[in-house]
Amino acid sequence: SLVQFETLIMKIAKRSGVWFYGSYGCFCGSGGQGRPQDASDRCCFVHDCCYGKVTDCDPKTDIYTYSEENGVVVCGGDDPCKKQICECDRVAAVCFRDNKDTYDNKYWFFPANNCQEESEPC
């Protein structure tokens, strides 16, 4: 679920997903079009693509199971669809963490009209 995604971002990237990525670049936040503007925006592009491959459950609302083992988030549970959502969220949170140093405030609340280029395929 989106609430769990926020929790994973806080755990892994040590920052608020809603605040930092709720409206960033062309892909972070609701919707997405154009080309990713930087590495953090690309994290969101890949996350959108990952959610797009989920067919048997709802990534935005379905609750998944995960645990922490030696500080590492491990997705679990018996439902393969929910596990897939968890993996999408976990990979994105790791991506945000790994690209914090190139996060650029100029892409915060980036106008959608700057995202008119043709999108690359997932």
UniProtKB/Swiss-Prot annotation:
Signal peptide location: none
Active site: 47, 89
A cellular-component GO term for this protein: extracellular region
Top-rank lineage group of the source organism: Eukaryota
Any Gene Ontology biological process: arachidonate secretion
Main location: secreted
Tissue specificity statement from the Swiss-Prot or TrEMBL entry: Expressed by the venom gland.
Keywords on record: Calcium, Disulfide bond, Hydrolase, Lipid degradation, Lipid metabolism, Metal-binding, Secreted
Any one GO molecular function term: calcium ion binding
EC supergroup of this enzyme: hydrolase
EC number: 3.1.1.4
UniProt-listed Pfam families: Phospholip_A2_1
Positions contributing to Ca(2+) binding: 27, 29, 31, 48
Gene3D superfamilies: Phospholipase A2 domain (1.20.90.10)
Cystine bridges: 26-115, 28-44, 43-95, 49-122, 50-88, 57-81, 75-86
InterPro entries found in the cross-reference section: PLipase_A2 (IPR001211), PLipase_A2_Asp_AS (IPR033112), PLipase_A2_dom (IPR016090), PLipase_A2_dom_sf (IPR036444), PLipase_A2_His_AS (IPR033113)
Assigned protein family: Belongs to the phospholipase A2 family. Group II subfamily. D49 sub-subfamily.
Role, per record: PLA2 catalyzes the calcium-dependent hydrolysis of the 2-acyl groups in 3-sn-phosphoglycerides.
The protein, known as: Acidic phospholipase A2
Organism this protein belongs to: Bothrops pictus
